[in-house]
Amino acid sequence: MGNCHLLNSGDLAEVEKLLLELLNECKARQTECARLPGITDISMYNTYVHDTYRRIIIVIDELAEILDKKRFPKAQHARIDNIIGYLSIIACTGRAFGVHLILGTQRPDAAVVPGQIKDNISFKCCGRAENVLSQIILDDARASELIPADAQGLFVCNDPDKTVFRAYYLDNKQLR
């Protein structure tokens, strides 16, 4: 695998193919770690073996655009189920083997993000949100309580310290 793959497509077949490749990479790493006594994760593997694995970060913005079956014809629903399955397995086992998910969505309720995926996402952050949305994302109301309504770019984390941070702003000129 190369250093960076950019998939900017609503083509479910492309998304499914790439996620299957990444899932297979995760399984290969798991198999390699299991082959060595006492090696249970990528950090241990990289410490004791010279062939180090790089971490893989999967970033999906607007997850609902991929997983919402109402947006696609019935013929695509099996493909969406496959994508959900791949993401669920990666969410469950990927971190130990250096495959990480960063998922973005406007409203991560059960209709958009299945419980198996949501339950295995350990770090969550939320921008200013009303009480119900904050409950869905962070399991409490801190996004409605800690972030002023007029604040732009502020987020609160699900850590015990209730960390609030400001996202870095890039304008269009800086993105070129």
Model regions and ranges:
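Short, low-complexity intrinsically disordered segments
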Residues: 42-43, 167
